[in-house]
Structure formats: structure tokens, C-alpha cells
Amino acid sequence: LIAKYNLTEKDLIAQQKNAISKTKYHIKTKTIYTIIYFLLIYLYLFITHTPGDSIWFGITVSIIFSPLLSIIYRHGMINRFRKDVLRHHQHLTGDFSLVLSDDELVKESKNSTERFNWSEFNQIKEDNDRYYLYITDLKAVTIKKEPENMNEKETKEFQALINRKKNSG
């Protein structure tokens, strides 16, 4: 099967959002930031010799605001991705051709060709419009679910192949 599609900045940001919420790396990093946040609150309360009631108030406030850390982390990572990766690596967007077989996946653009065996992907995730084939927690191949060059029957065959690989791995 040969699929042709265009990846935009929106597609890569969607992949980054998926990675932030589903990969071990980002989950561990968010956990570490949360622990550091609590330690800093407790350290501040200890250094300022805050009375007991204020310590409980500080703990309560830190627990209430801890969900904001996840939102701040996600927003920060997306902004960093926009500034660093998308600005300096414009070859990640544009027109791509994808050759799929039972053994491998070949991703081609005007600048490069990448070959992957299906066994190289440790996770295959998806959203409504895309598949994310993770090689590592930080490197993924983003594929549109509906290629531009395929009719409905070919698209279903294309999706069935990826879903078979997703369910077998």
C-alpha cells in the first residue's frame, strides 16, 4: 500500500500532546515536577517557621493547585516544541509518501527516506485523525488515518493493516 498525505504543524502538535499524556517519559517527568513542587512548598513553610495551622493551609493549597502543574507542563512542552523543533526542523512537515507492507514501513519526503520494521515500534497510539507509531517515548512517526490518494476501500485496507500491527504488538 502506498499512502500520500500532508503533515502540518497541527499534526505534529497533536502528536506532541499525545506523547505528553501517554508516554512513560512525560508521565515520569510530570511526577518529578509534582514532587519538586511539594518539596518547595514544604521547604518554604519550614524556612519561614510557619505555625501549624498555616502549614496545613499551605499543604491544602498545594494539593488544590497541583493539577495546574500538569496543565502548565503540557503548555510549556507544546510551546518549547513550537519554538525549538518546528522552527528549526521544517522538514518534519510537508508532503509524505508512505509505503506499507506486512514487514516494514517506508516514509519518504522530498528530503529523506526512512525505513522501519514494524518490530521497531514499541507503541502505536491514535486519535480521531492520526496514528502515532512510537519508536521511543520521544520519537514517533505520525500518519494520517485518511491518505489523500486513497478511495474508501483502500483507506479501510490501510487502516486495517495498521490496526492489525497495533493489536499484534
Regions found by a protein language model. Give the residues of each.
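Transmembrane alpha-helices and immediately adjacent membrane-cytoplasm interface residues
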Residues: 58-80
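N-terminal membrane-targeting/pre-transmembrane regions
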Residues: 1-47
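Membrane-interfacial hairpin junctions
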Residues: 45-57
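Phosphoinositide-dependent membrane-docking surfaces
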Residues: 105, 114-131
